[in-house]
Amino acid sequence: MAHYRVSSEVENIMNRDRSHRKNEEEDEEEALKLAAMEKLQRLPTYDRARKAVLKGITGGFKEIDMKDLGLAERRELFDRVMTMDDEDWHGEYLRRLKSRFDRVSLHLPTIEVRFEDLNVTAEAYAGSKTVPTVLNSYVNLLKGIGTKIRVLPDRKKRISILNDVSGIIKPGRLTLLLGPPGSGKSTLLKALSGKTETGLRSTGKVTYNGHELHEFVPERTAGYIDQYDVHLPDLTVRETLKFSAKCQGVGTGYDMLAELLRREKDLNIKPDPYLDALMKASVIKGHKEYVVTDYVLKVLGLEICADTIVGNHMKRGISGGQKKRVTTGEMLVGPVGAFFMDNISDGLDSSTTFQIVKSIKQMIHVFDKTALISLLQPPPETFELFDDVIILGEGHIVYQGPREDVLEFFEFMGFKCPERKGIADYLQEILSKKDQEQYWANPELPYRYVTAKKFEEGFKIHHFGRAMRSQLATPFDRLKNHRAALTRTTYGASKLELLKACLERESILMKRNLRTFVLKSLQLIINAILIGVVFWQQKNYPSTVEDGIIYMGAIYLEVQMIVFSGFFELPMTIDKLPVFYKQRHFSFYPSWAFSLPTSIITFPLSFVEVFIVVLITYFTIGYDLTVPSFLKHYLVLALCGQMSYGLFRCIAAVTRNHVVSNTMGCLAVMWLMTFSGYVLSRNQVHKWLTWAYWTSPMMYIQTAVSVNEFRSESWKDGLGVAVLKSRGFFVETYWYWIGLLALILSTILSNIITSLCLAFLKQYGISKTAVLPDEREEADSNNTTGRDYTGTTMERFFDRVVTTRTCNDKKLRIPFKPLYMTFENITYSVDTPKEMKEKGIRENKLVLLNGLSGAFRPGVLTALMGVSGAGKTTLMDVLAGRKNTGYIQGEIYVSGFPKKQDSFARVSGYCEQSDIHSPLLTVYESLLYSAWLRLPPDIDTHTRELFIEEVMELIELKALREMLVGYVGISGLSTEQRKRMTIAVELVANPSILFMDEPTSGLDARAAAIVMRTVRNTVDTGRTVVCTIHQPSIDIFESFDELFLLTRGGEEIYVGPIGHHSSQLIEYFEGIRGVGKIKEGYNPATWALEVTTRAQEDVLGVTFAQVYKKSNLYRRNKDLIKELNNIPPHAQDIHFSTKYSQSYLSQFQACLWKQHKSYWRNVPYNAVRFSFGAAVGIMYGIIFWSLGKRKGTRQDIFNSVGAMSTVVGFLSSQSAATVRPVVIAERTVFYREAGAGMYSALPYAFSQVIIEIPYTMAQACIYGVIVYGMIGYEWTASKFFLNIFFTFISILYSIYTGIMVISVSPNQEIASILNGVISTSWNVFSGFTIPRPRMHVWLRWFTYVCPGWWGLYGLTIAQYGDVETRLDTGETVVEFMKNYYGYEYNFLWVVSLTLIAFSMFFVFIYAFSVKILNFQKR
């Protein structure tokens, strides 16, 4: 015992000694720090702003230049300041920053946004003009012309979006914008941020600190955060935010810091060195983007996926909720002073939404910034974070004022919010005609529907409204405007810095798409080898002009190959345009900064590619073997590659659409190549078309290369000059340098036009859904059951369960078998991404789901919940059988039997989060198509249609039945309409088990209630329904029966009943040691997420996954699974006699019906292809006018064959190129529908190829009739119809080739490259540039497998195969055809059958590829 006391005393002495030494060390460190800071304070302000005092490696403080701050030092500095120990680390950090400004009385800039009498209207067509079809596109064009010249009346209707709205968004107060869909929220946000869409008419006044929008640059003063997530899929999250930070710059941050340092020096104030260093790093070029990006990543909770690519629907990346946060982060990294945020919580769980809004609120309050945020379903705890609320309805402001007073106003209007009702939900539902009456609380007056206009009038006479008008009547004192508040410079950084940022981004994208560039280079090399082999040593002993012309054909093909190699720039450029347009609106950079880096990046690549091509072709063909000739030849072709890239980028910028760009690209190349001087010699060009010859860059390229070769020493005795003259080329050597100069100028011109188009043209096809007032009323009244369906508290749902079941039993009488699903120990893992391995993660596999078990039963509605990235969608994909990548372990049973995917697809439905549908069908047609293919074949047509009508009524889609689905974010249905249609598409399939991924995401409270009412009614019919859900309101959450709660890492932490008022869920978590009690009225869903975070686990010292696995609840669930897996006697597994619901013939009929509807409405494809056929026909008719009547010389025949080769060459290439975007646009829909077991791949494939036949025939007739008549071919029935037939079959096999190529390609870029190889090989062996008899014997066989050769054979021999007219050489045309081309008239039927066989072969390859290949990674 004595020994213990002595030891204890010694230990106490040692502890005191250590504590004393520690205090001495801290005092010494503080003295060193103060000395270093005093030294820094003596520096001039400019130097002081660029230097800081930090602790060095040796332990002492030293002065460092911020420019030399390394990555490790920057990270350490960031971690020191952003202390994560405190839950309120963000607020504490902001307060420390603000405190530093307050100590020197330095006021930060603030912005007060006012809007007075703001009106926004749009014009829209009414009637059939609103539904695009091939026919009415032409009719509308003519009507539009008639309207312009005032021959026809204007049939547009003016739609009012915002009606005389006025208000004030105050700095330092967080304002919430609420309103139902179509109320004008997005329009108001855009109008206030200075980004009103093109086509909308705006009147009224918007001011910032008393300054109107034209007095400063609103794009850089205010940040608008769109509800649509548009990002480059190949960039990581960090790269996306860093690029945004670079472009937006530091604003006035550096000037404010300099002023702060000056005042601190005057007052002898020494700041915290670490905070000082971080503030300086955040405004120093080269460091700002890193510091701010890391800060925003931490605030938004994106650190976990910072180095993961964003991805898209075809490329796996981050989750939908994470994408939404990236969209928000893009603006937060900038220096803007006012934020207008549109639906930033879509796809986020309620806990994450709360944390993000809380962080934004802290920023707004501490720095007096301005923010107006639109949310669809704000949970109560998030709603309470806001200071003010604006409620918008039908374009009228219903209320604007303090959040805590909003209920008082509606009580003044006679309405009262029930208990346990979310205020935000109540505020949105009260504007609905169907929901309003239940909140009426004035017994003295009978209820009458109160419109938004009436609410607005009531607000004006309320004291809140009078106070608002009084404030608006007093103008803002412009003298109080801080000079740094409003931005007056167009861009946030210098032009050079913006160019560098775009160049860096482009280099990253090129690295990520390196495979595409490698394949494109490989395409060029293969084509070069083909040309080199075909023209192998053609001029060993050139002795005639004919030899020279054959050789000139090699030059023509080489130039054509290089020109077409730039075609892949079309899809690559257009894919990036949506991001460009978004960033253009934000004034991130000038248009040339977007286009120029692509030219710079591809410049060395192009020169290397062309060098390899020239090495292959120059020596195999046998060009002049002197160094100057070789270098000059290479230089022209290298510049030709640059010209080609510039040309196709220019076409992409002009057309802005995949289909239209492919069409116009082919048209441009056809025009240019026709006037290259080879297809049609200069002497044969009509005088009125000589301008086209002189403006064609191809003419200068062909002339330069030809002059360089034929004026060389290899072509002696004037033979080279004779060859040039025979085709009308210039013979003077200076034409080489003229050609070189013309190439450089055309390249520069293309880039200038590209930049101008990017700067001034709007995004292609933008058209939003507009609901006219009468349609709104119809939407409100289409449900015949009226208010019996409109209860908004879930108690009303349960009160109606019996009634609903009875109603459903009477109406929805299509039978189904109730099924349950169990699963045990489900583990899902993927290969660890390369980006994560580069960060030091050594595991080969990344586990996303970790040993999950559970059971889903009929009549039980299960919520699958968890924070973003917990694995909710992943689990649903695994259970539904939609995963095609990764590694799945565990067991899945359906009603006790092992799950068989083919049978399971027949009895299950999956509502995907991304709402993937065919854009050119109407709502009703989409439902009819789904029911047609998925309901049992014994259901008659009448019953099926009645069933569809009832589903549409249930989900309130009747008012939208004739509306096109449209493209997401561009046209057609709104987000919430699209979501409801997704559910309806699955419900009409009458599934026994239904999976729903985020069914309420993107919906407002009322739409979410409609959806959940539908879901509840579906469950009550005895179906098994599982929903992932992010941010449910109390009402929605408590409509579920059971909860499957996941945490990060894919582990289950609660699987069981929710209970009345969430009692069982609350009881479970409150029973865990250390978990606090839920607050009265708090959302249980949000509370469950908040108390189970990883941070809470660290605080409590528990792992919730382990707690669950040790609980009685876990054991009960295991027993339940075991019990359900015990198959009862006489039970039978799900079995169907066929894999699909419908026969192959019915599948084909349904798919063909859908293709017919889509094609008839696909104006950019079919109307453009008809117009293209007419344009090309007229163009070639003019160029080759009356050429068919001339048959006196070989040159006449050559020119005529050249005209025919356009069908085989250019028209066919255009057809193959334009069909690719159409097919690939439907591919994602095909993956969803095939995954749902709707049809086999073969009926789908055959419907795709069959639907092309009538449209191709129409195109062939349009082109053929025009060309045939204008060129003047012989007017006999047989020759005319043969010409039409060979034109038709040549276009058709080319279209089938394009379809085939896209079916074996993961994306359009790869398809473009593969198509380039095929097109070049067909052109080389078509027999135009080098006829078959002139080919080497060992190569002639290839013409038999070349459709281009057969196509030209058929067109030529049908016209000239029986012509006995003698040529100037003495031989007849028939003899010339046989001797020169190898064509014989009696071979005509063989040619016809062969071309049909080629078409069928390409169809077979397409069908086979569609069946076995899947490029979607899930």
Swiss-Prot record:
Residues 497-710, 1146-1360 form the ABC transmembrane type-2 domain. ATP 2 binds at G866, V867, S868, G869, A870, G871, K872, T873. It comes from the Eukaryota. Expressed in roots and siliques at low levels. Gene3D superfamilies: P-loop containing nucleotide triphosphate hydrolases. Residues 147-419, 821-1073 form the ABC transporter domain. It is a multi-pass membrane protein. Its main location: membrane. Keywords: ATP-binding, Membrane, Nucleotide-binding, Repeat, Transmembrane, Transmembrane helix, Transport. This is ABC transporter G family member 38. It comes from Arabidopsis thaliana (Mouse-ear cress).
